[in-house]
Amino acid sequence: MKGIILAAGAGTRLYPASQPISKILLPIYDKPMIYYPLSTLMLAGIKDILIITNELDHDNFQKLLGDGSQFGINIQYKIQYVQRGIADAFLIAEDFIEEDDVALILGDNIFHGFGFSTFLKQALEYKYGATVFGYRVKDPERFGIVEFDKDMKAISLEEKPLNPKSNYAVVGLYFYDKHVCEYTKSLTPSKRGELEITDLNKVYLEREQLNVKILGRGFTWLDTGTQDSMLEAANFVRTIQANKGQQISCLEEIALYKEFITPDELEMKLARFKGKSAYYDYVYDLINEMKSTQKKLVLK
């Protein structure tokens, strides 16, 4: 499976903060926002990743993440020149996807929870169709909504309905089979001229190929599209990290945990950052622990 991060939005709701730089590069507490969705794909075991940016911020993303080799992964980049909706990502990425399954995550979505890596692994066990994730919200009219029957089988999807049929939002993480580009090409742009991700999911639903997994108690989903939600996310990350003494979405830690890279390789790649910040002190502590104990890293 390959992965796509859609990070092309202008972030106008955050102006003036996002005028000089993409909102996806703004910090959520101690790390850039892009680290959080990238960590989700890495936790799912995905190593080939495409980041779709806007034209202005393309170079900034490359400067931050490079080709991904420092994490033992492969990162490519493409530009979305015109905002044509979330599903447009699959048309932009068609030559990257080829005949593979693909995961798409929105650049401003943060996920956290005990056992999240195992949860993602279970979701990847579906060998056909699409898998999306439902999360209970108090304001469903703001989101794409999935309705279930009495057996919790998805029966309908609606985009920001005035009268929601459920309180379960479809979050910004989607897994698709190799037919996703074909199905995307069949979509008609919405009234706002965009290829809607809800319409794509409806194609899979109509074919009885849509799987919905619920992010239940113990999992947190944060959509950081506003100033208040960014502050909420930063406070959440700060609190969890302070209480547990562990980083959230530390890419180097996940790379070690998934064995994408060895401690020695990572130490060499991070030499210029040694002693520069608390974040890198944390990474070096992990490296030293692994080298001294010769044990595999356990991600808690």
Regions found by a protein language model. Give the residues of each.
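A structural signal for short hydrophobic beta-strand segments in well-ordered beta-sheet cores
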Residues: L25, V146-F148
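A secondary-structure boundary/capping signal
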Residues: L106-G107, F133, Y176-D177
